[in-house]
Amino acid sequence: MHWMELWKAIILGMVEGLTEFAPVSSTGHMIMVDDLWLKSTEFLGKYAANTFKVVIQLGSILAAVVVFKDRFLDLLGVRGRHPGGHPRLNLIHVIIGLLPAGVLGVLFEDYIDEHLFSTKTVLIGLVLGALLMIAADKFAKKAARTQTVDQITYKQAFFVGLMQCLSLWPGFSRSGSTISGGVLVGMSHRAAADFTFIMAVPIMAGASGLSLLKNWQYVTAADIPFFIAGFFSAFVFALLAIRFFLELINRIRLVPFAVYRIVLAVVIYFLYF
């Protein structure tokens, strides 16, 4: 085991954990940090490196499960119904939100992998996603009628699901597109963020699990320590990032993240081209 390469795995896990759920594009950051600096393909090989990125994403997913564990127990009916008969987020909201991107993702997975994963397309996604986020903040109603995730309607859930389709374009950012969509239909930034993270777990787990099954044969026993280090690094930093972001989003909204995305796109452009 090479300790320097183990540290690279930890750093990549950190980058994944910090950026997966923020509206800044984890793909864009992985391009800048991995492709231009750490180069995981050099010590893992191309296919094992791709599998490694799937594994560290699973670490981020586990962090979201931990943060929202009570909510998931409610959705699954383990904790019983919410007392008082008040409106409550349920599985139908989540399913409605998942369907559009889930269907398109299954139909066009191979096309997206073959034709849309390039530095140029990620740069386009970074900029277009930033413009959407700026527009969402500009045109959002000053007083959001949906303050909490439990007040979300089925129509709002479906619109957020439609907006999630934009995240199939690499670099667009799942949370950037869905939080923007939620804000545009009258949700508070916090309600939109909560729904985004809850909805992200099943769709990310499904996509990552499928990719892992397809590519696991490329992993050797020597790679396992790097995978474990990256997984736990992503888990820890995602845990911190999710909690921090949820406290921050209602205060600063989306524009600062949009500006950051544009700066990131410019930096990647000058480093890569």
Swiss-Prot record:
Membrane spanning residue stretches: 4-24, 48-68, 89-109, 116-136, 152-172, 193-213, 222-242, 252-272
Keyword terms, alphabetized: Antibiotic resistance, Cell membrane, Cell shape, Cell wall biogenesis/degradation, Hydrolase, Membrane, Peptidoglycan synthesis, Transmembrane, Transmembrane helix
Catalytic activity entry: di-trans,octa-cis-undecaprenyl diphosphate + H2O = di-trans,octa-cis-undecaprenyl phosphate + phosphate + H(+)
Membrane topology of this protein: Multi-pass membrane protein
Gene Ontology BP term (one): cell wall organization
Broad class of where this protein is predominantly found: membrane
Recorded GO CC terms: plasma membrane
Subcellular localization(s) per the UniProt record: Cell membrane
Enzyme Commission designation: 3.6.1.27
Signal peptide: none
GO terms of molecular function: undecaprenyl-diphosphatase activity
Record-stated family: Belongs to the UppP family.
Function: Catalyzes the dephosphorylation of undecaprenyl diphosphate (UPP). Confers resistance to bacitracin.
Other noteworthy facts: Bacitracin is thought to be involved in the inhibition of peptidoglycan synthesis by sequestering undecaprenyl diphosphate, thereby reducing the pool of lipid carrier available.
Protein name: Undecaprenyl-diphosphatase
